[in-house]
């Protein structure tokens, strides 16, 4: 074989049709993996051998699934061959619920590899049975039933990107103090000092997602002064958190009921952190629980 590239990183992407393997391979390509989709298992070992001889290839990701037809059962033999040759690899297995997969196939109008549209559910269940043993060998199992493409990308970035900025994520939650503090927060920010839309009859039943409320909160001189200082603080802190090996910063932003001010500030902070290049997930814990007064 010649000089081997012993540092070659090998990812095998597999799982259920419609679970997001194409999106996964695109994400991995974005972070530097040499990607091959629908590689026949019989060619897999030879491809890895050639990649190990190439100085230009450091990371490979291979999508192998039931589209390989009669060749797919060969995958177990190839994995054994890799292990016998002491070649390390990781398996990423993507799946989703039957209901979600049926919906995705109907929306895309694509044919399932194992059957026609008239027996779609049967085809999905048959594929699930075929992949059960391989699923048990997975190093990273991802259920995409409730994941957006962006959230799937964030999961893969956090695990496989060598860029520390990409591996770091901020989780921002808005909440109402009347309903208790989030228990898993690193930073808790009290924004009850900001102007309160609740006391304007037009905005009382609105939320921080409504344009009128957003403008009311963000156009305040107090808010502008606060957000400038708060974002500067985060800009200062986050690089130090990354340096210490922290991969997630949980930020909780609270107002009285979690309906107006905290929602606006959580969304605004999330957008600003994204502009800085960080992965951000924003959720609003109490936005639907605003029956009590702020």
From Swiss-Prot:
Keywords: ATP-binding, GTP-binding, Nucleotide-binding
Amino-acid positions noted as binding ATP in the UniProt annotation, renumbered to this chain: 15-22
Residues where GTP binds: 65-68
Domain of life according to the entry: Bacteria
InterPro entries from the UniProt entry: P-loop_NTPase, RapZ-like, RapZ-like_N, RapZ_C
Presence of keyword Lipid metabolism: no
Any GO MF annotation of the entry: GTP binding
Protein family membership: Belongs to the RapZ-like family.
Role this protein plays: Displays ATPase and GTPase activities.
The protein's name in its UniProt record: Nucleotide-binding protein Swol_0262
Taxonomic source organism: Syntrophomonas wolfei subsp. wolfei (strain DSM 2245B / Goettingen)
Lineage: Bacteria, Bacillati, Bacillota, Clostridia, Eubacteriales
């Amino acid at each position: 074989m010649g000089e081997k590239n012993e540092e070659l990183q090998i990812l095998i992407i597999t799982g259920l049709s419609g679970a997001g393997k194409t999106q996964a391979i695109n994400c991995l390509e974005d972070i530097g993996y040499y990607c091959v989709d629908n590689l026949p298992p019989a060619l897999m070992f030879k491809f890895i051998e050639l990649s190990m001889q190439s100085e230009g290839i450091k990371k490979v990701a291979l999508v192998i699934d039931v589209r390989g037809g009669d060749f797919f059962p060969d995958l177990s033999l190839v994995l054994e061959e890799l292990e016998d040759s002491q070649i390390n690899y990781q398996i990423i297995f993507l799946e989703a619920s039957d209901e979600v997969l049926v919906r995705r196939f109907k929306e895309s109008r694509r044919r399932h590899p194992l059957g026609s549209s008239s027996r779609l559910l049967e085809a999905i269940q048959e594929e699930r049975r075929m992949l059960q043993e391989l699923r048990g060998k997975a190093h990273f199992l991802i259920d995409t039933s409730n994941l957006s493409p962006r959230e799937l990308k964030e999961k893969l970035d956090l695990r496989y990107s060598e860029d520390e900025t990409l591996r770091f994520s901020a989780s921002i939650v808005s909440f109402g103090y009347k309903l208790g503090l989030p228990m898993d927060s690193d930073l808790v920010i009290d924004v009850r000092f900001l102007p309160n839309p609740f006391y304007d009859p037009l905005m009382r039943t609105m939320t921080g997602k409504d344009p009128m409320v957003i403008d009311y909160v963000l156009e305040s001189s107090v808010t502008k002064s606060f957000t400038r200082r708060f974002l500067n603080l985060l800009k200062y802190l986050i690089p130090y958190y990354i340096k210490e090996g922290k991969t997630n910063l949980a930020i909780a932003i609270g107002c009285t009921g979690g309906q107006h001010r905290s929602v606006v500030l959580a969304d605004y902070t999330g957008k600003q952190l994204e502009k800085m290049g960080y992965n951000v997930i924003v959720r609003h814990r109490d936005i639907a629980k605003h029956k009590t007064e702020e």
